[in-house]
Amino acid sequence: MPALLERPKLSNAMARALHRHIMMERERKRQEEEEVDKMMEQKMKEEQERRKKKEMEERMSLEETKEQILKLQEKLSALQEEKHQLFLQLKKVLHEEEKRRRKEQSDLTTLTSAAYQQSLTVHTGTHLLSMQGSPGGHNRPGTLMAADRAKQMFGPQVLTTRHYVGSAAAFAGTPEHGQFQGSPGGAYGTAQPPPHYGPTQPAYSPSQQLRAPSAFPAVQYLSQPQPQPYAVHGHFQPTQTGFLQPGSTLSLQKQMEHANQQTSFSDSSSLRPMHPQALHPAPGLLASPQLPVQIQAAGKSGFATTSQPGPRLPFIQHSQNPRFYHK
């Protein structure tokens, strides 16, 4: 049977120490609980304070809010008014600046125009003085300028044409023009009908002026200078005998045909027959000098002459090779 062990009896000191220890532990636990309770109470108080504050914020009246809105609106209106005043001031400054700039520009334009007029007056006076020159040659530059202006306006050379002479006196002394259409027994000193030119023969008035560069291709008789002065200028009728004797007509006609076959100078259309009087004129008709006849024919024929005429050939005789130039 097991033996029973008896607990030894505690001494008084040990019993008091154990009692103290237990009491301290209890006290410590109670303090901890109290601290926890205090913390919980503090938290609850803080929570209540937050709730109260929130409730107070929620309890704020609508009038206070309206008052705040009115204050903000007044502040905004003041800012807008200040902005408007600044804008008006800026506009005024810009307008004044524009007026000042226009005034300066107008003053500058006035000064520039005045200076330009003054310089133009001085330049014109200097130019007139340089043009006048010395007193001895005062009128000469103006005359030369007028002459140059006239040359520029009217060309270097002006040709004056006139109607073709209707009288046979213009061709007096030239044996080639002795066979005009008229009475068989008419003399050269009497008036005869004008020679019959081509259907497209141009007629010009005495007052009409033709410039030299453009006159030559326009008139069909103003061509290049021909080597002969006695060219036939129209259609003539070879049926009139004139001053030839009947015995020599046949031989002269044969010579003329032979010459027409040999020559290489012909018109664009056909060779016009020439009267035998042009080859073998009467001895009485050759009494007048040929030089005045040429001058008279050139002056009265109505054809415009150039400043440099072509070479003049003497009258063709029977001994020379007969070549005829027809217009």
Swiss-Prot record:
<keyword id="KW-0963">Cytoplasm</keyword>
<keyword id="KW-0539">Nucleus</keyword>
<dbReference type="GO" id="GO:0005654">
    <property type="term" value="C:nucleoplasm"/>
</dbReference>
<dbReference type="GO" id="GO:0010875">
    <property type="term" value="P:positive regulation of cholesterol efflux"/>
</dbReference>
<comment type="function">
    <text>Key regulator of inflammation, lipid metabolism and mitochondrion homeostasis that acts by inhibiting the activity of the ubiquitin-conjugating enzyme UBE2N/Ubc13, thereby inhibiting 'Lys-63'-linked ubiquitination. In the nucleus, can both acts as a corepressor and coactivator of transcription, depending on the context. Acts as a transcription coactivator in adipocytes by promoting the recruitment of PPARG to promoters: acts by inhibiting the activity of the ubiquitin-conjugating enzyme UBE2N/Ubc13, leading to stabilization of KDM4A and subsequent histone H3 'Lys-9' (H3K9) demethylation.</text>
</comment>
<feature type="coiled-coil region">
    <location>
        <begin position="14"/>
        <end position="109"/>
    </location>
</feature>
<comment type="subunit">
    <text>Component of the N-Cor repressor complex, at least composed of NCOR1, NCOR2, HDAC3, TBL1X, TBL1R, CORO2A and GPS2. Interacts (when sumoylated at Lys-71) with TBL1X; leading to protect GPS2 from degradation by the proteasome. Interacts with UBE2N; leading to inhibit UBE2N/Ubc13 activity. Interacts with TRAF1. Interacts with TRAF2. Interacts with TRAF6. Interacts with PPARG (when in the liganded conformation). Interacts with (sumoylated) NR1H2; interaction with sumoylated NR1H2 and NR5A2 onto hepatic acute phase protein promoters prevents N-Cor corepressor complex dissociation.</text>
</comment>
<keyword id="KW-0496">Mitochondrion</keyword>
<dbReference type="GO" id="GO:0030183">
    <property type="term" value="P:B cell differentiation"/>
</dbReference>
<feature type="cross-link" description="Glycyl lysine isopeptide (Lys-Gly) (interchain with G-Cter in SUMO1)">
    <location>
        <position position="71"/>
    </location>
</feature>
<feature type="compositionally biased region" description="Polar residues">
    <location>
        <begin position="253"/>
        <end position="271"/>
    </location>
</feature>
<feature type="region of interest" description="Disordered">
    <location>
        <begin position="300"/>
        <end position="327"/>
    </location>
</feature>
<dbReference type="GO" id="GO:0005634">
    <property type="term" value="C:nucleus"/>
</dbReference>
<dbReference type="GO" id="GO:0050859">
    <property type="term" value="P:negative regulation of B cell receptor signaling pathway"/>
</dbReference>
<dbReference type="GO" id="GO:0010804">
    <property type="term" value="P:negative regulation of tumor necrosis factor-mediated signaling pathway"/>
</dbReference>
<dbReference type="GO" id="GO:0030332">
    <property type="term" value="F:cyclin binding"/>
</dbReference>
<dbReference type="GO" id="GO:0034122">
    <property type="term" value="P:negative regulation of toll-like receptor signaling pathway"/>
</dbReference>
<feature type="compositionally biased region" description="Polar residues">
    <location>
        <begin position="317"/>
        <end position="327"/>
    </location>
</feature>
<dbReference type="GO" id="GO:0045599">
    <property type="term" value="P:negative regulation of fat cell differentiation"/>
</dbReference>
<dbReference type="GO" id="GO:0000122">
    <property type="term" value="P:negative regulation of transcription by RNA polymerase II"/>
</dbReference>
<keyword id="KW-0832">Ubl conjugation</keyword>
<dbReference type="Pfam" id="PF15991">
    <property type="entry name" value="G_path_suppress"/>
</dbReference>
<dbReference type="GO" id="GO:0050728">
    <property type="term" value="P:negative regulation of inflammatory response"/>
</dbReference>
<feature type="region of interest" description="Disordered">
    <location>
        <begin position="253"/>
        <end position="285"/>
    </location>
</feature>
<dbReference type="GO" id="GO:0035360">
    <property type="term" value="P:positive regulation of peroxisome proliferator activated receptor signaling pathway"/>
</dbReference>
<keyword id="KW-0805">Transcription regulation</keyword>
<dbReference type="GO" id="GO:0005739">
    <property type="term" value="C:mitochondrion"/>
</dbReference>
<dbReference type="InterPro" id="IPR026094">
    <property type="entry name" value="GPS2"/>
</dbReference>
<keyword id="KW-0488">Methylation</keyword>
<protein>
    <recommendedName>
        <fullName>G protein pathway suppressor 2</fullName>
    </recommendedName>
</protein>
<dbReference type="GO" id="GO:0003714">
    <property type="term" value="F:transcription corepressor activity"/>
</dbReference>
<dbReference type="GO" id="GO:0045598">
    <property type="term" value="P:regulation of fat cell differentiation"/>
</dbReference>
<keyword id="KW-0804">Transcription</keyword>
<dbReference type="GO" id="GO:0046329">
    <property type="term" value="P:negative regulation of JNK cascade"/>
</dbReference>
<feature type="region of interest" description="Disordered">
    <location>
        <begin position="178"/>
        <end position="208"/>
    </location>
</feature>
<dbReference type="GO" id="GO:0019216">
    <property type="term" value="P:regulation of lipid metabolic process"/>
</dbReference>
<dbReference type="GO" id="GO:0003713">
    <property type="term" value="F:transcription coactivator activity"/>
</dbReference>
<feature type="modified residue" description="Asymmetric dimethylarginine">
    <location>
        <position position="312"/>
    </location>
</feature>
<feature type="cross-link" description="Glycyl lysine isopeptide (Lys-Gly) (interchain with G-Cter in SUMO1)">
    <location>
        <position position="45"/>
    </location>
</feature>
<dbReference type="GO" id="GO:0017053">
    <property type="term" value="C:transcription repressor complex"/>
</dbReference>
<dbReference type="GO" id="GO:1900045">
    <property type="term" value="P:negative regulation of protein K63-linked ubiquitination"/>
</dbReference>
<keyword id="KW-1017">Isopeptide bond</keyword>
